[in-house]
Amino acid sequence: MYSVAVMPALLASGWLQSQGLDPRWGQLGLFLLAAVLLLGWENLSNDVFDDDTGVDTVGKPHSLVALTGRRDRIAWIANGLLAGGLLLMALVALRSQPVVLLLVLICCALGYLYQGPPFRLGYRGLGEPLCWLAFGPFATAAALMALQPPTSLPAAVPWQVALSLGSGPALATTLVLFCSHFHQVEEDAAHGKRSPVVKLGTAKAAAVVPWLVAASLALQWLPVLERQWPSTALLSVIGLPAAAQLIRLLREHHHQPQRISGSKFLALRFQALSGLGLAIGLGIAPWLGR
């Protein structure tokens, strides 16, 4: 699950290498650790917030609050992870540029808007766009600025690069969230959580999945076709078999919650493999003379 946390930094590292720049590996290690801690906060706090509304009673067996029955303790742990992650990000920003911390704080704010009271925008079906923004342009821009060599620090936030580099992989991350709703449609609807799958119904939502996969890969391959990226970036194709399995599973069994409870893990495999393939493909390009 934590591949979604580390992907922006891995992509930034690969892109910098494709540009003939040497990423700051110490910064990369700190950024990765901080990102994992912050996603831990997001996941645990979401368990807490969903427990408050009762939506996790049946459909979310992996909820630590549901498993342990210790809501307050999980909330304390979540807040500790948030504090630790932000402290590490502050150190990363101190060693690069202060705006890195601001970008990460925006990502955290988007994460809170998703499930946190009084907003709970995920209950209005807005979780997916929030996810794309956080793991796409904002996290990717933060990683690019944090990992740049001191002699090559950009004067402004590199939004154009962050969008071209982060949009496709972030859409794959958004697909993971989208697929997590399929097996708990009835429970979500009963508790007022109007996820996109609840709004569309499982059949129509399953028909959307191939388009999300295609859009994610298209956004990753378009810069190659425009000769902005090396052809080795097409290595993201290694995620395609997992995507094909996901599409087939949801097409045939979208109405059977028990059969599709693992669909988000297939989406996660697609996200991890396609993103890692893109990062590696970019990173090895100079070695292959591309």
Go through the PLM ranges and name each one:
Residues 131-185, 191, 203-207:
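Functional transmembrane core segments of multi-pass inner-membrane proteins
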Residues 63-153:
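Intramembrane alpha-helical segments
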Residues 37-59, 174-197:
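Acidic (Asp/Glu-rich) catalytic motifs at the cytosolic membrane interface
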Residues 58-96, 193-229, 265-274:
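Multi-pass membrane catalytic core of lipid/isoprenoid biosynthesis enzymes
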